[in-house]
């Protein structure tokens, strides 16, 4: 990826949760301030840095240096990269390492990595010694705009994604936009799907801005920081109103009911990154909304066109290996969606669209129209 165009002073977004509220600090090179911010937040604390091998190569030394500069002790806990670490075995590894390192309740866990590391480290922090505070240092675009904010932590089960976990808010989020320069184009695009999601579900003006500025976001600088800050503000506002996802927060799952099933169907593998699953899932949700008469075909096409223009998959046939390996059939995908966290009394709940910028929660969706819709999309050869 090319060098950033320009950059400005850090942006701070507040997650307003009373005495459990925290700041998201966004900007280029803000990782350098990690030590001073932690020292002010938790004087005398030791830290354990949970990261994966790939991130450790690029950013562990710099993170430890920022802590060393103010005399903060840090101990690295390195897991394998990829969704496979977000498992019972990965959780056991991190928990046992935290206990062995004698990390106490006045110390801090630092999650240095993408969504997998953040979810895993946050969940481990929530259960070791009945709760350790933790700091999110997200190193992927997806993690900076989504998974590091709002306190959802957890691991996957063989039955599905994110089925074991807890709500556990961080005490600080440091979103350094410079670290995104080390992402592959595919990783960056996958994170962009979550950025586009915020426009699609609740802010048409932001979506239009993304349509006009997505190339500048890729290049970096102030457009990238604006996109991240706008996304974080949108999520922070919803989390402040509905922390435990009893209502409005479910809107943030636009694209995720279909997307999570597709991730499970591809074995949580590199065939389909999470953000890519969300992209395909959002388009499917929009098309299903149009079939139900809720959304215009033009609006569904607008969403699909923008995601495709960025380089994201928008059709089931775009999933890597579809032609060679195929995908689960409609019945198998329905079975995977039946494990979705939004299912109530066995009935499916979908996040659908009435317009670009207006999502709604659709309860008690009949399964047969969904199964028929998926069967047609799987058979689509266009």
Swiss-Prot record:
GN (gene name): aroB
NCBIfam families linked: aroB (TIGR01357)
Class of this enzyme: lyase
Cofactor note (record): Binds 1 divalent metal cation per subunit. Can use either Co(2+) or Zn(2+).
Name of the protein: 3-dehydroquinate synthase
EC nos: 4.2.3.4
Binding site for Zn(2+): 194, 256, 274
Subcellular location: Cytoplasm
Biological process per Gene Ontology, one example term: amino acid biosynthetic process
Family statement: Belongs to the sugar phosphate cyclases superfamily. Dehydroquinate synthase family.
Recorded GO MF terms: 3-dehydroquinate synthase activity; metal ion binding; nucleotide binding
Stored HAMAP family: DHQ_synthase (MF_00110)
Co-factor requirement: Co(2+); Zn(2+); NAD(+)
Pathway the protein acts in: Metabolic intermediate biosynthesis; chorismate biosynthesis; chorismate from D-erythrose 4-phosphate and phosphoenolpyruvate: step 2/7
InterPro entries xrefs: Dehydroquinate_synthase, DHQ_synth_AroB, DHQ_synth_fam, DHQS/DOIS_N, DHQS_C
Pfam families named among the record's database cross-references: DHQ_synthase, DHQS_C
């Amino acid at each position: 990826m090319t060098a950033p165009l320009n950059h400005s002073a850090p942006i701070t977004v507040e997650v307003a949760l009373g005495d459990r509220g925290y700041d998201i600090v966004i900007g280029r090179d803000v990782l350098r301030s990690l030590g001073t911010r932690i020292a002010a937040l938790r004087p005398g604390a030791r830290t354990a840095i949970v990261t994966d091998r790939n991130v450790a190569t690029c950013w562990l030394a710099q993170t430890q240096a920022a802590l060393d500069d103010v005399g903060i002790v840090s101990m690295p806990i390195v897991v394998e990269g990829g969704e496979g670490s977000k498992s019972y075995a990965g959780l056991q590894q991190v928990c046992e390492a935290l206990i062995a390192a004698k990390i106490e309740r006045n110390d801090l866990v630092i999650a240095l990595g993408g969504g997998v590391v953040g979810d895993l480290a946050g969940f481990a922090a929530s259960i070791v010694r009945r709760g350790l505070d933790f700091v999110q240092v997200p190193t992927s675009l997806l993690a900076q705009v989504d998974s590091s904010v709002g306190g959802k932590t957890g691991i996957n089960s063989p039955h599905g994604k994110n089925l074991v976990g807890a709500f556990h808010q961080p005490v600080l989020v440091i979103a350094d936009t410079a670290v995104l320069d080390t992402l592959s184009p595919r990783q960056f695009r996958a994170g962009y799907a979550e950025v586009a999601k915020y426009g699609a579900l609740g802010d048409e003006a932001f979506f239009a801005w993304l349509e006009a500025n997505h190339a500048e976001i890729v290049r970096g600088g102030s457009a990238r920081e604006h996109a991240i800050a706008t996304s974080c503000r949108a999520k922070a506002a919803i989390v402040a109103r509905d922390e435990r996802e009893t209502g409005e927060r479910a809107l943030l799952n636009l694209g995720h009911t279909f997307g999570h099933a597709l991730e499970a169907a591809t074995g949580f593998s590199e065939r389909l990154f999470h953000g890519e699953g969300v992209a395909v899932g959002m388009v499917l949700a929009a098309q299903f909304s149009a079939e139900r008469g809720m959304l215009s075909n033009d609006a569904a096409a607008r969403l699909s066109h923008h995601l495709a223009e960025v380089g994201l998959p928008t059709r089931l046939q775009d999933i890597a290996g579809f032609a060679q390996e195929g995908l689960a059939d409609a019945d198998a995908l329905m079975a995977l969606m039946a494990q979705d966290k939004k299912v109530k009394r066995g009935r499916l709940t979908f996040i659908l669209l009435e317009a670009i910028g207006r999502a709604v929660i659709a309860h008690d969706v009949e399964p047969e129209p969904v199964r028929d819709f998926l069967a047609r999309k799987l058979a689509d050869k266009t």
